[in-house]
Amino acid sequence: MIVIFNSDGSINDTDFSDYVQQGSNGANMLQMAYADSRREGMSAYLIAQRPNGTSITLPCHEASFDCNGEHYDGWQAAITGQFTLYAGAVHCTVDVVDGEEQIQANYPFDVIVNPTGNPIDGEWDEQINVAQYNSYMAQL
């Protein structure tokens, strides 16, 4: 699932079909070159659901994860913009440093594309983006 937010919090329904290719493992790959995403003013974010039900939103360069036998380091994801996507909620092993908290578990996650290019920096932005995500999910 790709969720795109405008700067005012509304949902952007941009067609990203040109970016989606079939991966070697049969999963859909969102291949968005880092330079292209920066030029178009977009940044990719990961939203992971903690076991207690709360969410964390963070730039992909702060996370590493494994999906269907493929491993993505944070810096790798930020540079290549390659993410394995499945229909609906996807469960992958996500290794996230959340402040002093080291999280490693199977979390569902979605890739969030923010057209403003503004980084998620600090608790306020994280809460705002999680609220946008929850609002979007409620519309489904």
Show where each model-derived region lies:
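Low-complexity, Pro/Ser/Thr- and charge-rich linker/hinge segments at domain boundaries
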Residues: N114-N134
